[in-house]
Amino acid sequence: MKFKLVPEAPETLAFVADAQRAVPLVPGSEDDCCARLMRRLDFPSRDVARTWLTFLRAVELADETDDGSFVRQDTDPTPDHLRDAFVRRIYGASDVLALLDSEPKSVSEVFEGFEERVPVWEHHRAAESWQDVWTERVERMLAWSVLLGLAERREGGYVAAEHA
């Protein structure tokens, strides 16, 4: 399963651990989990909290149970774990990374290379703004890639990380 929602990248990976700790060990409803995330991490809205909850599921730090409640996973959010889960489970992450090389590319240039991978149904779902929505998603994937050491930000754009 691949996930599309990616929150804005935080300043440090320690924030991911804080977000994971905000998800209960005892299963809770989506509303309860979002309220906890908002309270503990000062998220400005339920939408931001829900995006983080979805992202935590994507990177295998939280899970949705069969009854629709959410629970924290007993997985350490190490950089290696986060890199692996990000590339495997975030829709488009591996494609975005494959577009990077040693020449800096702007967000627009990366989106241009990625655009054909946007599912057709997404074009109809947000007909007037799908390109804006997906450009923002690409930008967020790039920011997370930098945070995770999979890419580097240089003058003029993003490049593949030398060790990635």
Residue ranges and their predicted role:
Residues M1-A164:
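Donor-sugar nucleotide-binding helix/loop cap in glycosyltransferases
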